[in-house]
Amino acid sequence: MSMRTIAVTSAFLVAAVVVSAGTAGATPARPDHDPATGRFDQPHQGFAPAGTVLRDGTPQQAGLDPGPIDAAVAQLNGWTRDDPTTGHPLYSGQVTLLAHDGVIVTKEAAGYALRYADQQGGLLPTTEQIPMRTNTIFDLASLSKLFTSIVAMQQIQAGRLDVDATVASYLPQFASNGKGAITIEQLMTHTSGLPADPTPPLWQDPDMASRIDSILDTVPQFTPGSTYLYSDINMIALQLVLQKITGKTLDVLVRDGITRPLGMHDTMYNPPASLKPRIAAEEYEQGPGEPQRGLVWGQVHDENAWALGGVAGHAGVFSTVDDMAILAQTILNGGTYRGHRIMSEQTDAQMLTNLNQAFPGDAHGLGFELDQRWYMGRLDSTRTAGHTGFTGTTFVVDPVSRSFALQFSNRVHPSRNWGSTNPARRAAADGLANAMAVRAPGGVSWYSGIGDASTATLTTPAVTTTGEPVSVDYATFVDTEPGSDLVTLQSSTDGTTWSDVPVTATGPGAPTGTVTTLSGGARAWWRVHATLPATSGPLELRWRYVTDSLYTGRGVNVTGVRVSDASGPLFDGDRDQQAFTGTHWVLTDR
């Protein structure tokens, strides 16, 4: 195992050791006794207690505001109804499960697992339609990559696989066409330079042997390690390595190493026909350039996985939200659930540590995607992990708040061409993030609100300065899209012309030095100080929060505003809260 890989996990593990030191023989966690429960501004370090076991509860029992969760579920359910603009829903049906600190705070199903009679959206007779249920089984699509990666990490942990070794050292044929230098790590972080998909697709090859040769003889698109390119071929190649070193097929490795010990009884490749009524239907494949499969229902949707017999490193796993909740909590617990450990804390940490720092925006651990706001929404952070699946599945695990959001839809039923479901992916995570509290040190704060392409301002009353430099001090909580959604302190002597004020911030994750804008997602309160040049006459201050057209964080909170000069206090924002003028800003206690 790479010493470099071990080193990058050390900070995570130090925190994990502190957290887990007292958890031997622990009973299931009681989230209502944790002072950080329900808090968005109390980031956890390390893993949850190893004894944390999921239990059903209400948002209130987890310290959450039920309003944002109810609103998110209503929106997610609403997308199962026909849109007047498109004439069809965003997806046929969906199931959402949200959990915080070991409490499943909502689990809702809406729409249909089977609804359509053809690719154009003709409806089946009502008697043949199948409603979506919370125990519906979904084709996970690329969420399957997480299972392949966990199996690989188990083999690395056991010393049978070296993350720094070349793939060709296990599969000599893989060295063909200049691939000899590609490493196992590069497969797992999508930095191998391999193309996204096999060309031609594997189902066009005549037999299994030729399909395997197609993978092994792939021509790279880029030099290994030179770029990030998400590739299904990476995970299929990893599958072949795992099968070579263990002598077992991937489905057996997943069953024996993950699903059986964790009790994930509804998780499998190639589900039996007896389960078909519980499985969400998918696409009608009958167009040009597609295998003529008709309605894909109960078989893997991905054509390359189908060509590999339904068991593939990149796709093929079927599961429910309940089973995937167990996997999510296992990750949060440091690799264990109900006393069944599937990997060590160090191994778990390596899956959650960014190894792609050379490729900003494409953060990736050994298996998990990291810090992807486009589907992680307001749960996003540098430590938030997850994956999506083409069929409509979304898996987001946030160790910072010990929360996870699962949003599964059958978006490809009846056609893959009905549009993106990324708004739904974010909505589930946003609802959970918005339900958590941001509690100001003094009890209440001014809150910016949330919205794309919006501007919110919070303005002090005019104060009279005395010709001395003016000091401004306040506390702020900033959770915004880094570098894009910015909050700025501004000053004006006439109420019309505004100038940016340089500030310094202190606290976990605060920017270094003097800056004119604040953004990011440290999930911690910062103390902010600014000094304005000596001036005489009226002076107003305002906080201006501007968002771009896509993606927002939890927003901005401001409290404890103090304006003073050498003569003494000029304005105390806590004593005179109603003196502020807020446009889209509101007073809140959470």
What are these regions, as identified by a protein language model?
Residues 34-50, 108, 113-115, 119-120, ...:
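Short, surface-exposed loop or secondary-structure junction motifs
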Residues 65, 145, 320:
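Short, conserved phosphate/pyrophosphate- and ester-handling motifs at nucleotide-, phospho-/glycolipid
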Residues 49-61:
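Acidic/histidine-rich, surface-exposed loop or edge segments in extracytoplasmic proteins
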Residues 162-178, 260-262:
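Short, glycine/proline-biased beta-turn/loop segments that scaffold the active-site neighborhood
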Residues 1-28:
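Secretory targeting and sorting signals
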Residues 70, 348-355, 372, 378-383, ...:
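Beta-sandwich/jellyroll recognition modules and their flexible linkers
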Residues 70, 74-80, 96, 102-110, ...:
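Active-site SXXK
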